[in-house]
Swiss-Prot record:
InterPro entries: ThiC (IPR037509), ThiC-associated_dom (IPR025747), ThiC/Bza_core_dom (IPR038521), ThiC/BzaA/B (IPR002817). It is an enzyme of class 4 (lyase). It catalyses: 5-amino-1-(5-phospho-beta-D-ribosyl)imidazole + S-adenosyl-L-methionine = 4-amino-2-methyl-5-(phosphooxymethyl)pyrimidine + CO + 5'-deoxyadenosine + formate + L-methionine + 3 H(+). Its cofactor is [4Fe-4S] cluster. It comes from Bacteroides thetaiotaomicron (strain ATCC 29148 / DSM 2079 / JCM 5827 / CCUG 10774 / NCTC 10582 / VPI-5482 / E50). It comes from the Bacteria. One of its GO terms (biological process) is thiamine diphosphate biosynthetic process. Its EC number is 4.1.99.17. This is Phosphomethylpyrimidine synthase.
Amino acid sequence: MEQKIKFPRSQKVYLPGKLYPNIRVAMRKVEQVPSVSFEGEEKIATPNPEVYVYDTSGPFSDPSMSIDLKKGLPRLREEWIVGRGDVEQLPEITSEYGQMRRDDKSLDHLRFEHIALPYRAKKGEAITQMAYAKRGIITPEMEYVAIRENMNCEELGIETHITPEFVRKEIAEGHAVLPANINHPEAEPMIIGRNFLVKINTNIGNSATTSSIDEEVEKALWSCKWGGDTLMDLSTGENIHETREWIIRNCPVPVGTVPIYQALEKVNGVVEDLNWEIYRDTLIEQCEQGVDYFTIHAGIRRHNVHLADKRLCGIVSRGGSIMSKWCLVHDQESFLYEHFDDICDILAQYDVAVSLGDGLRPGSIHDANDEAQFAELDTMGELVLRAWEKNVQAFIEGPGHVPMHKIKENMERQIEKCHDAPFYTLGPLVTDIAPGYDHITSAIGAAQIGWLGTAMLCYVTPKEHLALPDKEDVRVGVITYKIAAHAADLAKGHPGAQVRDNALSKARYEFRWKDQFDLSLDPERAQGYFRAGHHIDGEYCTMCGPNFCAMRLSRDLKKNAKSDK
């Protein structure tokens, strides 16, 4: 089961740290062919620089490494984690459910075989990236993300505000999250915050009727190839525990989950039977496996549930509907809200971040920015402060379905009420009339809210509202959202964001077709369309033909102007 990811004319490169010289920050270098010009009859070739691009493919794109999915990825961060001296390796897993799955011999054929014993903070030790940052410590993870965000800006002479100290300060103040469970050492450090590159998340996961472990692992790798910055396993079908283990051990990006889904499976789908003890064991189980962040719908309050009654589409969040029903059936405050401090105590022992789930997000543009949505946001603002008190990194989930003229209010209100914690939104979709094209309706809103300050965008595929996405849907969703995120980075003026655009535009003007393909987000798709047009590698395409190509005519004008001089 060896896996490789390849990109045309690209080379995997590693930049060293300065504070920590032994760290190797992975990125991809794209080679370009020379520009060709003529001085009279003389042909002149002028070299074009290599272009460095952010790379989420991990060791899978390193030709010097052999990756076997049955053994998992190299444990990149384990030496850093253990070297700090504040964690201990447990003699065995401590989750009751995890132990039960481990001891069930009927699952041996499904099990990932090379499972390491989990780590946990030593008693009295604060081991989260936020705790280190508050103490003024720049960790290897912090320097790693600073280098990764800048790529080769220093070499290009591009000024940047993103230094290891800036990263530390943003994490200490809660303005950025570096999701890095100590039990997922395979993950390459990355950062989520509005003063950094806009990130995208990919949702995968099986359902009760569809998919297998192999398919979900394949989707995870596929997401990493095309640029997914984080991955959420939203499995609700069989063998959730084993599926998650396979994904985490082979995933070079942070992995998130919604623990309430598995907790509900443990009570056979009966919401009334959910309780704190089952949920607590689920948290520990997943912390010990290596989940980097949890979506937790603790913002649902007993007194807020009825606010959704006025809506056209009610409650559309799975986690939100589960907790709302639990509150109503028991006529009690949510156990997630009541035990939020206990939740944070657990997460802090493994450095798991909390993503405060928007259980009352609007599911139609009719319901956008309503009382229910903003009441939950107010509670999230309270919860984020409680998380920070426990040194738990936190970010805020947002909508949803929001027309363009209401997007700005979402961003401004989130910054104010949630103390500038990172915002993480699902789109938003700006219209409801395009089933089958909701990757487009949502990317329009995603680009806009990313520009306004959202730190991470949750992708939407063409099958949103229709079916479980397959591998091709994952590709389309990721590429669509990479476009939205990059458009936001350009609008925000992120250091070096325009380097790739300028290189591709120059290649287009000079009819360097191969460079256009190789610099694009999806080289295979671009080249496929070009070849399907029966082109030769000439100075025009079939869109305009030889006589109507504006760039060709523009180049001729330049040549004539040069000759006149």
